[in-house]
A protein has these predicted regions:
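Active-site-proximal, Lys/Arg-enriched surface segment
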Residues: 2-85, 91-92, 195-206
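An internal, acidic/charged active-site-proximal segment
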Residues: 94-206
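Major-groove recognition helix of helix-turn-helix-like DNA-binding domains
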Residues: 1-2, 125
Length: 206
């Protein structure tokens, strides 16, 4: 195989894609979506094939032989019959070979393309709960414009914000009381799609 760094093609794709965003939609958010997918193989002689755990399998077994790819996709706004529609453009894929974690692969891809978004004001990274960990959160803190939206694990411990200083001696509290997702959140009266929604600033460990 040629020893060529193909990651530069991610930058080229992102740069060309951003040119397609209409001028009157450039204030709309851009989404960088992170996910991973598995490709099963029936043979065992394929290069880098391995036994993988598939939590979404419906074949009676949660394991399969195949490859796992981490993907980064750009979703950008365009006009479609006078309505805003988001166009999905794949930026890059990395095969997970178990030498590096999927978090490391995802973080590296985001860092690779972020220079192309330096002039964008509203960049949002979307991912599921598996990626909401320090490796990826630290990338968000390295740049001025990105934000991150991700699912929290169902067993995540969440706390109220730290109380105001009391002036008493001793170390101030780092967080407030522990919160319950069942009783400490005010949800909307009506569903948004399939879900009730609510908002509250909290603290958690990731």
């Amino acid at each position: 195989y040629a020893k060529v760094d193909c990651s530069v093609f991610m930058n080229v794709t992102a740069r060309l894609s951003l040119r397609l965003v209409p001028a009157d939609l450039r204030s709309q958010p851009l989404f960088l979506c992170i996910d991973d997918t598995m490709v099963s193989k029936f043979g065992k002689e394929f290069e880098d094939v391995s036994k993988l755990f598939d939590h979404a399998a419906h074949n009676g077994s949660h394991y399969l032989n195949g490859h796992c790819f981490v993907s980064l996709m750009l979703c950008m706004p365009v006009w479609n019959r006078d309505k805003i529609s988001y166009l999905a453009v794949p930026l890059g894929y990395r095969m997970w070979k178990k030498k590096e974690s999927k978090l490391v692969l995802a973080s590296a891809m985001v860092r690779q393309v972020m220079p192309e978004f330096h002039a964008q004001k509203n960049v949002i990274i979307l991912c599921d709960s598996w990626y909401v960990k320090q490796n990826l959160v630290s990338v968000v803190e390295e740049y001025e414009n990105p934000e991150l939206i991700g699912n929290a694990r169902a067993d995540s411990v969440i706390y109220d914000l730290a109380p105001l200083p009391t002036g008493r001696k001793g170390r101030p509290a780092k967080h407030g009381r522990r919160l319950s997702i069942d009783s400490d959140f005010t949800l909307s009266a009506e569903k948004a799609g399939d879900y009730y929604t609510g908002y509250r600033c909290v603290l958690t460990n990731i």
